[in-house]
Regions:
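C-terminal substrate-recognition/cap domain of FAD-linked oxidoreductases
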Residues: 106-300
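FAD-binding subdomain of flavoenzyme oxidoreductases
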Residues: 1-121
Length: 304
């Protein structure tokens, strides 16, 4: 279930070696593909039968993952299917700062109760998501004020530093309950405050809406892009700091208006590291050759 599910294809997932938000439970694209057909300039490549595992040689289909059209066009893919889970629950946790969130994610990655999906968003993305929430009315308005008072005044969280984790748990009722109980316990250990299922679900809905937010921003001459990389746990902050600094330098060098936007989240956790997903935006109002300048900035950012 990749973030781009509405705007992408199965062949595209294979060609880009894609991952999805629920890879913890169902695997990445390479884990769920059984057969692939590919059309190349030399003819059609067909995999005769599924190969679950072989101890001799390698799986030829592995060459096609991440090939990005260089070998040919993927025309057919047979995927494994899973039963729809009996139970699904969303949840969310608010942490005092980014480091607390990282500590929670790292310890969670070593447990036996990793949920189908778990994401850590930085303060900027957290506030962005809050800004896009529908304005509460009636009882919900008072409930929202009480929640805000509790988090900021009672718990002492700084609105400009707090970050959030969103969670999706799937499986049998007993599996989901086990995950929820232990995730709650671990969150409290790292000074987290449970934010509830509504905030958790809304966090994932923002993921699907981001392409439309990009199109909306384009009307106001703001260009945006996303990029991701996988790094060891020990290098997370180094990569974030280097990327943020590089964007600021490039923004100044190109004499662009306003301030650059950059935010990040950790959508995937692994035993030895994480995937960091960056979102960036730049105003190009009044800029000559904006596409060319933005393309150069993007390539420079990817090198970091």
């Amino acid at each position: 279930e990749p973030d781009s599910v509405e705007l992408s294809t199965v062949g595209g997932w294979v060609a880009t070696n894609a991952s999805g938000m629920k890879k913890n439970r169902y695997g990445n694209i390479e884990d769920i593909v059984e057969n692939i057909n590919l059309v190349s300039p030399k003819g059609v490549v067909k995999q005769i039968k599924p190969i679950s595992r072989g101890s001799i040689g390698f799986k030829p289909q592995n060459i096609l993952f991440g090939s990005e059209g260089n070998i040919g066009i993927i025309t057919k893919v047979i995927l494994k299917i899973h039963e729809i889970p009996n139970s699904q629950k969303y949840n969310s946790v608010i942490f005092k700062d980014w480091n607390d969130g990282i500590g929670f994610m790292k310890e969670l990655s070593k447990t036996n109760y990793i949920p189908a999906s778990v994401r850590l968003v930085d303060n900027i993305q957290f506030r962005f998501g809050q800004a896009l929430k529908p304005r509460p009315e009636g009882f919900k308005k008072y409930k929202s004020k009480i929640e805000k008072f509790f988090v900021t005044k009672v718990k002492g969280f700084d609105p400009d530093k707090m970050c959030a984790v969103t969670v999706v748990m799937e499986g049998t009722s007993s599996e989901v309950n086990y995950q929820e109980k232990n995730i709650t316990k671990l969150a409290k250990k790292h000074r987290g405050v449970i934010g509830g299922s509504g905030n958790g679900k809304r966090g994932y809905m923002l993921t699907y809406a981001i392409a439309y937010v990009r199109d909306f921003a384009a009307r106001y001459q703001i260009m945006g892009e996303t990029m991701e990389t996988t790094v060891p746990w020990s290098k997370i902050q180094d990569v974030i700091d280097a990327t943020t600094k590089k964007l600021e330098i490039l923004h100044q060098e190109n004499n662009l208006p306003g301030k650059p936007y950059i935010s990040y989240r950790i959508p995937q956790i692994y035993h030895t590291g994480v995937c960091i997903y960056f979102m960036l935006g730049i105003s190009v109002k009044g800029v000559s050759d904006p596409e060319e300048k933005f393309s150069k900035i993007e390539h420079s950012m990817r090198k970091v």
